[in-house]
Every structure is written in C-alpha cells, then in structure tokens.
C-alpha cells in the first residue's frame, strides 16, 4: 500500500500534534507547519500528495496560500480546514481550486476519507497526462 504524504498547515501547535499522531497511526506520513509562508517553503523542498490548509492564519492567509499552491504545485491537492464561522471561506477555496473543505470539529475518519479521495483524484489526473 502506498503511504500518502500530507502537509498540515495550522497556527495551533496542539492541533498539529494531535492530527499528526492520529493520521500517522493510520499509515499517513504527516509533516506540519504553522503558517502559509512555511508551507510554501516546505513544498519547494518536499513534495506532498495532499495539503490540509487552515483558512484563518496570521500572515499569509489560507486562501492566499491556496492560490500560491495552485500556481506553483499543481499536482498537490488541497483540503481547506475551516470553522463553522468561516464556511464561506471553504466554499471560496473550492472555487479557487481546492479539492475539498472540512469543517472543524471533524472526525479523523472523515478527514482520512477526504485525504484518500484527494490522493486518488491527483493520481488519476497525473496518469491521464502521461
């Protein structure tokens, strides 16, 4: 089985530790960063399959980070992470090229299903280009 590589971008360190631990137990390779600038720098050096991207972060917003990921790393799928108050941002993310969005709080199995679907979507798109 192929191990999916995921980058989680969120400004809450405790949330990052929790998600990393829970996804790693489910055979997902997880790296974490705390802001959009760090995400873009990480992606330049370490390609991943899926980015889980918080909408609301200090500095470069999740939406602006998404725009840069779509421009520079077109084979990387993005799942926007949003709170109930920012549902519109998740929908905006979809219109800007995110694969999906998920509302906090969420179940880890729901997130894992979306990660797997995003991974498969990217894999099929890459195969069609060959």
Kindly label every feature range from the protein language model.
Residues 17-25:
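Charged docking surfaces used in two-component/phosphorelay signaling
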């Amino acid at each position: 089985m192929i191990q999916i590589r995921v980058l989680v971008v969120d400004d809450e360190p405790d949330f990052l530790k929790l998600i990393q631990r829970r996804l790693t137990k489910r055979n997902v390779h997880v790296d974490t960063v705390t802001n959009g600038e760090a995400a873009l720098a990480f992606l330049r050096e370490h390609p991943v399959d899926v980015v889980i991207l918080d909408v609301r972060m200090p500095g470069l917003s999740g939406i602006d980070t998404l725009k840069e990921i779509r421009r520079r790393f077109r084979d990387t799928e993005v799942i926007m992470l949003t709170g109930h108050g920012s549902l519109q941002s998740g929908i905006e993310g979809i219109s800007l090229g995110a694969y999906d969005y998920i509302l906090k709080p969420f179940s880890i199995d729901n997130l894992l299903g979306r990660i797997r679907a995003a991974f498969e979507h990217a894999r099929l798109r890459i195969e069609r280009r060959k």
